[in-house]
């Protein structure tokens, strides 16, 4: 089994290194090949997603991704900025389903920004559609306004759109995920304002007929944002579009105490996937050895479960992380009184020891 390892920028190389150590400690034979991506790709090849990196990603059975982005690239034209690498990989590999779990471990309830009783036992899965919506809809750009109150003025415009096949496939993925969990699915939309999401709602309702054992509910995105803070444990699986999912999954991340704890998976129709932590490249702490590697290590566990069919090994890693937390090891982002503060490498070593 071949794994493409794409560390990226900022803290990416540090946290990916710890996940690779954990994978190497398993009783499995993985072929792991590393390639530059993001700012590192731009420095090496003049493009955030070099041809050889894309070729490797296409050939691999799964991709372990770090993070991309750095302020020093903000002056580049948009097509050359590091963040275009992840968008390019999603597009070329047809990664349409993003899984973002938000789990609050018992030991970390004190690190959450909410009261412990609101988040204790929290286990949400957000299923986000990745290939459509306003992020990719055409046409888009800057032009002279052709009509309206400010006709002739410069305006920016984007297009929100979803096709029926796009909605159906993400709905099926979400219903199947809910069927394996608490059998509750909440579809988040803005059907009261947007035609696109009235259409979304209609299609999701139609797909629901194939899953009679799953309870389907609907919620407007503004209310969903409020309920995630007010009563987060009322959710099990949430399915939504690209932009809403982008925002809600980051909000849900902070319910858990730190975005540094949350893995994610982006899958194609055959469960080949790209696995990455939910956080960014954090260039302000890069090289300091203080970043939390647990989200990346847990992303490696998701990779084993969804793309490599190694569920038992995934369980081993997840249980090792739970053990390390129970032992009181904490990086700075999840530190609470009475716990032992460690750095990136020490946290990785603790997980290895727990394995």
Curated annotation (Swiss-Prot):
Keyword Protease found: no
Keywords: Amino-acid biosynthesis, Branched-chain amino acid biosynthesis, Cytoplasm, Leucine biosynthesis, Magnesium, Manganese, Metal-binding, NAD, Oxidoreductase
Residues carrying the site annotation Important for catalysis: 135, 190
Coiled coil: none
Pathway field: Amino-acid biosynthesis; L-leucine biosynthesis; L-leucine from 3-methyl-2-oxobutanoate: step 3/4
Broad class of enzyme this protein falls into: oxidoreductase
SMART domains (alphabetical): Iso_dh
GO BP, sorted A to Z: L-leucine biosynthetic process
EC number(s) stated in the UniProt entry for this protein: 1.1.1.85
Cofactor binding note: Binds 1 Mg(2+) or Mn(2+) ion per subunit.
Record-level GO cellular component terms: cytosol
Catalytic activity: (2R,3S)-3-isopropylmalate + NAD(+) = 4-methyl-2-oxopentanoate + CO2 + NADH
Cofactor: Mg(2+); Mn(2+)
Database matches in PROSITE patterns: IDH_IMDH
HAMAP family: LeuB_type1
Role this protein plays: Catalyzes the oxidation of 3-carboxy-2-hydroxy-4-methylpentanoate (3-isopropylmalate) to 3-carboxy-4-methyl-2-oxopentanoate. The product decarboxylates to 4-methyl-2 oxopentanoate.
Protein name: 3-isopropylmalate dehydrogenase
Source species: Cupriavidus pinatubonensis (strain JMP 134 / LMG 1197)
């Amino acid at each position: 089994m071949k794994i493409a390892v794409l560390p990226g920028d900022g803290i990416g190389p540090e946290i990916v290194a710890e996940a690779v150590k954990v994978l190497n400690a398993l009783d499995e034979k993985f072929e792991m090949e590393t390639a530059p991506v993001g700012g590192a790709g731009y420095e090496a090849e003049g493009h955030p997603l070099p041809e050889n990196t894309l070729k490797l990603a296409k050939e691999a059975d799964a991709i372990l991704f770090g993070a991309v982005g750095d302020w020093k690239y903000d002056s580049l034209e948009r097509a050359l900025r590091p963040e275009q690498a992840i968008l390019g990989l999603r597009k070329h590999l047809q990664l349409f389903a993003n899984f973002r779990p938000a789990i609050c471990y018992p030991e970390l309830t004190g690190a959450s920004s909410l009261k412990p009783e609101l988040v204790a036992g929290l286990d949400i899965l957000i299923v986000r559609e990745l290939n459509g919506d306003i992020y990719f809809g055409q046409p888009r750009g800057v032009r002279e306004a052709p009509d309206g109150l400010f006709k002739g003025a410069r305006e920016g415009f984007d297009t929100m759109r979803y096709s029926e096949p796009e909605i159906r496939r993400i709905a099926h993925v979400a219903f199947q995920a809910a069927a394996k969990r608490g059998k509750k699915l909440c579809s988040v939309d803005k059907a009261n304002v947007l035609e696109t999401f009235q259409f979304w709602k209609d299609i999701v309702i139609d797909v629901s007929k194939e899953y009679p054992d799953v309870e389907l509910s609907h919620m407007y995105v503004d209310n969903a944002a409020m309920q995630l803070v007010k009563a987060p444990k009322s959710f099990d699986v949430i399915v939504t579009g690209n932009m809403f999912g982008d925002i809600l999954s980051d909000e849900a991340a902070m319910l858990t105490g730190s975005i540094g704890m949350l893995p994610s998976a982006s899958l194609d129709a055959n469960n080949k996937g790209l696995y990455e932590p939910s956080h960014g490249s954090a260039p302000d702490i890069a090289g300091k050895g203080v970043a939390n590697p647990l989200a990346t290590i847990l992303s490696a566990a998701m990779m084993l479960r969804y793309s490599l069919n190694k569920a038992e090994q995934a369980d081993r890693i997840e249980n090792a992380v739970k053990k390390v937390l129970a032992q009181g090891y904490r990086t700075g982002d999840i530190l609470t009184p009475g716990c032992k503060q460690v750095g990136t490498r020490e946290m990785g070593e603790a997980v290895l020891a727990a394995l």
